[in-house]
Amino acid sequence: AETYQRVTQMGNHIHNDLPNYRRVVERIKSGQLGKVTRVQIWKSSGEVTRGNLSETTPPPELDYDFWLGVAPKRPYSPLRSHGTWRYFWDYSGGDFMDFWCHISDVAYWALDLKAPDRISAIGGRFFNLDGAETPDAFEAQFSFPGLNYTFSLHPGPMPGFEHMGNIVCVFQGTEATLVTTYGKHE
């Protein structure tokens, strides 16, 4: 944006479209949890395999060169296309880059968080041996004063919260714990 002197804006559709986040923020800001000392975000990395990276001819309805845009030219593979493109560094940063902004939005909003002091992360590709590139297991620690904030990416739902689905945010306070997804909380 700076190079081309453009103004940009990032919006988060879940923040605006689903009333659950607003209700979670109200509960946390009202003090129902006490002082929140820990936020843990969990995203399931999904199924064990998404297919293989076999090269083929793009379907006739897909203008593959247009779809690639400025990304490096690569042979077409359905795995590099719709729905799974996010697992290749040429196009995305994987599940973390795709989903972190959505589920962490509620924590930033509820706790009035700004930029962390530092972030450390470790991960790799251990489970989905399908030719994709981005991590399928990942742990990130965000350093905020007085707050333990982590993001975890692993196969399967968060242990203990399987009933909540594949992406959750857990707020642990001195008085209570709250777990939320995009559409519900408890």
State each model region's role.
Residues 2-3, 18-26:
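Glycine-/Pro-rich loop/turn segments that contact NAD(P) or position catalytic residues
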Residues 5-6, 22-23, 35-186:
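Contiguous beta-strand/loop segments that form the cofactor/metal-binding neighborhood of enzyme cores
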Residues 1-16, 31:
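Beta-strand-loop-alpha-helix segment that lines the small-molecule cofactor/substrate pocket
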